[in-house]
A protein has these predicted regions:
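Non-catalytic nucleic-acid-binding/docking modules located in mid-to-C-terminal regions
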Residues: 49-54, 86, 107, 148, ...
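Noncatalytic, basic helical substrate-engagement surface that gates or grips nucleic-acid strands
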Residues: 1-135, 141-161, 246-248, 254-262, ...
Length: 300
């Protein structure tokens, strides 16, 4: 009864960079990201046999409620005009084709206005019964790991063939922190990929020490003010001086878990609405065996 949540942008970026850009449709349209995404999805279904699946997409990759409190949030990824997200020119035309194809396959796609895909996945993870497997290359989602409800992250940093299945023990081994405190750790450490600086002067070791001794930001700040022996004076001083950033860090780092999700059937599609449309897209864009592999994985 496994639910599989696909971090779609993470997958199509990984597919784009992992497949040769010489893969082209008959009309010259690049299709490497499309083919890679389909291939990964087929393999993931074969590995984990989910009975529910959602392709989660960005409603807004820089939600206003995060940017309003921290204008630099993900600003490092903005295009030169300061509007959209910078992405490879050869990837951009592939995304609408891929989304059309997923729609024809009957794979549910969910994106909610003013929320990131991370927030959508987090809400599904807390609202839907487990087991849940969250497929991503993004470590931000480690905060969703929940051993009691069997929520794990299929982490693709090393590729699908060598992926890690992240549970609390994995987090504890990797970062030397309690497995349920990754978000707290990230608040202090920061995340350059999202333009988040963390608390000035506190790196991974300092953040790990804090996460090992305190359950949340308020506790850590109180410990710093009290000059608790678990904190060296220099570290306590940095926590105190980082008070302004720490006021907003939870909103920036914690995934929203109360997104208003649309009512839809997230069961694995048992048959296509019109298989001929899938084959038409396959032929038009020269998608070859990638489409066939997903059809096989779905047991149509």
């Amino acid at each position: 009864m496994t639910l599989m949540l696909l971090d779609s942008a993470s997958l199509w970026y990984r597919a784009y960079y992992g497949m040769p850009d010489t893969l082209l449709a008959p009309d010259g349209t690049p299709v490497n990201a499309i083919r890679g995404y389909l291939d990964m999805t087929a393999r993931l279904i074969g590995m984990y046999s989910p009975n529910r699946i959602v392709a989660c997409i960005e409603g807004d990759w820089r939600p206003s409620w995060r940017v309003d409190i921290f204008p630099d949030y993900k600003a490092n990824r903005l295009e030169e005009d300061g509007e959209g997200e910078e992405e490879p020119d050869l990837l951009t035309p592939q995304i609408p084709i891929l989304l059309d194809l997923l729609d024809e396959f009957g794979i549910p796609m969910v994106g909610v206005d003013d929320y990131e895909a991370d927030d959508v996945m987090a809400t599904f993870a807390v609202k839907e019964p487990g087991p849940t497997r969250i497929v991503t290359g993004d470590r931000d989602l480690f905060q969703l790991v929940d051993d009691k409800r069997d929520v794990k992250v299929v982490y693709l940093a090393k590729g699908l063939s060598q992926h890690d299945l992240v549970d609390k023990a994995w987090i504890a081994r990797k970062y030397a922190i309690p497995g349920d405190r990754y978000a707290l750790f990230a608040m202090f450490r920061g995340d350059p990929s999202d333009g988040l600086p963390g608390v000035k002067g506190i790196g991974e070791k300092g953040a790990a020490l804090i996460a090992n001794n305190y359950a949340d930001v308020d506790e850590a700040q109180q410990g710093a003010r009290d000059a608790h022996p678990s904190l060296k004076p220099a570290l306590a001083k940095k926590i105190i001086e980082g008070a302004d950033y720490l006021k907003i860090a939870p909103t920036l780092v914690n995934c929203a878990r109360d997104v208003a999700l649309p009512q839809l059937d997230i069961s694995m599609p048992t048959k296509p609405a019109d298989l001929s449309k899938i084959y038409e897209i396959k032929e038009r864009y020269g998608l070859g065996a990638s489409v066939d592999r997903l059809i096989t994985a779905l047991k149509w």
